[in-house]
A protein has these predicted regions:
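Low-complexity, acidic Ser/Thr/Pro-rich "mucin-like" tracts of secreted and single-pass surface proteins
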Residues: 132-176
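Hydrophobic or amphipathic alpha-helical targeting/insertion segments
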Residues: 277-278
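Surface-exposed, short loops/turns at beta-strand junctions within beta-sandwich domains
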Residues: 102-106, 260-265
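Tryptophan-paired
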Residues: 1-10, 14-19, 26-145
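Solvent-exposed, low-complexity, repeat-rich "mucin-like" stalks and linkers
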Residues: 168-243
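A short beta-strand micro-motif common to beta-rich folds, especially ectodomain repeats
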Residues: 263-274
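Low-complexity "stalk/linker" and mucin-like segments enriched in Ser/Thr/Pro/Ala/Gly
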Residues: 62-86, 215-252
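Short strand-edge motifs at loop-to-beta-strand transitions and within beta-strands
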Residues: 14-16, 149, 253-255
């Protein structure tokens, strides 16, 4: 804690009252799991993009990505963190549902709840929920010192139209480079997967350019898909057993797919614009 009082005279005896304020913010998570036929099993709860540095007085400078770290907590339903301030900034958002990756500042602090969701009479799917911190305003993403943030989160489904919901195991989670080809195991309990689909070619954000046509694709050449679809797949049993049962596009920039019942196979999926043109 810290404080100050400028009303001080060094030539006389002084009795000073100094108001102290906390140098950190308190973040509390209260997690409620489904209480019906659906089942959600938590695998990890993380606090992402936490500032590493703590200053005696309030900082006005934005935090850089190099000054951030991540916290991993236990999987209990009630967790409290004490963290330094993070001036991630504000946006023009007006709807709480739009607070997700791509709309939020890259350095904004958020809670990531990971686990396996099994809907009633459905198959298990890996899923993560991202909840960004900020003031009582959809546009604000700042974490301010001497402030308490209470997040009451209730898990209620895996809606692909909600950008805060990340359905499927993330195949592009290793770093900024994604691939144009992925291999997954059909024997895993999880049948749902996702990968980033906002950059052409192999998705590299670096100077490496790869194009299946042989033409040059500028590094980081971004696209803005509206939907995704199946282009081609192998099928078993005279075409009745599919490699993929579902292909879709989520609002947060991922193509999401669900494995079919085929024990092995190949498939091609594509990101598309609003006119169904392949991007």
């Amino acid at each position: 804690m810290c404080g100050s009082n400028d009303n001080f005279d060094s030539n006389t005896a002084n009795t000073l009252a100094v108001s102290l304020t906390r140098s950190v913010a308190k973040v509390s998570l209260n997690l409620t799991l489904p209480n019906g036929a659906d089942l959600f099993t938590v695998s990890a709860i993380k606090l992402m993009n936490v500032a590493k540095k703590l200053y005696y007085v309030e900082s006005t400078a934005p935090t850089t990505s190099a000054e951030l770290t991540d916290y991993t907590s236990d999987n209990s339903n009630t967790i409290t963190w004490y963290i330094p301030e993070n001036k991630a900034g504000t946006t023009s958002l007006t709807d709480w549902k739009d607070r997700y990756e791509g709309n939020a500042p890259a350095t904004a602090t958020y809670i990531l709840i990971e686990g396996s969701y099994t809907p009633q009479n459905g198959t298990a799917r890996d899923v993560a929920y991202a909840i960004y911190l900020g003031d009582n305003d959809p546009a604000d993403f700042n974490v301010t010192r001497n402030t308490k943030y209470t997040v009451n989160a209730s898990i209620r489904g895996t809606n692909l139209d909600d950008g805060r919901v990340l359905v499927g195991k993330d195949l592009s989670a290793a770093g900024t480079r994604t691939a144009n080809c992925y291999v997954v195991k059909t024997t895993d309990a999880n049948k749902w997967y996702r990968f980033k689909a906002t950059v052409r070619g192999n998705g590299a954000q670096t100077a490496e350019d790869i194009s299946y046509t042989g033409a040059v694709i500028p590094a980081g050449d971004k696209i803005s898909p509206v939907k995704a679809g199946l282009v081609w797949e192998t099928r078993d049993n005279n075409g009745t057993i599919h490699t993929l049962d579902y292909v879709g596009y989520s609002r947060n920039g991922y193509i999401v797919f669900k494995l079919g019942s085929a024990p092995e196979g190949n498939a091609v999926v594509a990101a598309k614009d609003g006119a169904s043109k392949i991007l």
